[in-house]
């Protein structure tokens, strides 16, 4: 009888342990969601057709963002920073648009090459001012990163030296 009680107690402990393990695995699976961002440059053909000018917000633009979220994307990288705006939306508007679609703003890729005058003179202060505004706008849009996707190829060693100083 004592053996039977011990075996029953052992079986009960094993059942409780396995049940707890199964529940913790189920909770872990439910919590696990991959973070996957999409570079909006990859859907530029669609975005180039939207009309967000004059402060209005094109329905096709919002639909695209919502569809990206439905596909499983969790964040976006912008690729259209121009005159202080992203896709003709102010940084605050862009952030609200993206977040209302269920996505996060992660990053942007943009750059500013040096003009011929800047390369010749070595004075790139106007480009640095542009970057100051660019960084402020990206922060306002909620971005954590800015990627420079390309750089003009310098034609001379002097131009290369100027670019090196500029990029520092």
Positions of predicted regions on the chain:
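Bacterial Sec-dependent N-terminal signal peptides
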Residues: 1-29
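Generic structural signal for short, solvent-exposed loop/turn connectors between secondary structure elements
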Residues: 12, 152-159
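N-terminal pre-domain/capping segments
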Residues: 18-141, 158, 162-165
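Histidine/acidic residue-rich metal-binding segments in metalloenzymes
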Residues: 168
């Amino acid at each position: 009888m004592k053996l039977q009680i011990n075996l029953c107690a052992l079986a009960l402990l094993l059942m409780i342990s396995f049940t707890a393990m199964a529940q913790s695995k189920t909770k872990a699976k439910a919590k696990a969601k991959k973070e996957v961002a999409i570079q909006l440059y990859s859907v530029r053909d669609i975005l180039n057709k939207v009309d967000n000018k004059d402060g209005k917000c094109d329905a096709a633009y919002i639909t695209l963002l919502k569809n990206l979220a439905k596909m499983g994307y969790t964040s976006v990288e912008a690729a259209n920073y121009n005159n202080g705006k992203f896709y003709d939306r102010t940084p605050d508007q862009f952030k609200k648009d993206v977040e209302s679609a269920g996505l996060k703003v992660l990053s942007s890729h943009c750059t500013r090459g040096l003009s011929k005058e800047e390369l010749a003179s070595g004075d790139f202060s106007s480009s640095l001012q542009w970057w100051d505004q660019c960084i402020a706008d990206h922060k306002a849009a909620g971005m954590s990163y800015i990627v420079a996707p390309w750089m003009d190829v310098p034609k001379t060693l002097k131009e290369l030296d100027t670019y090196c100083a500029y990029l520092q």
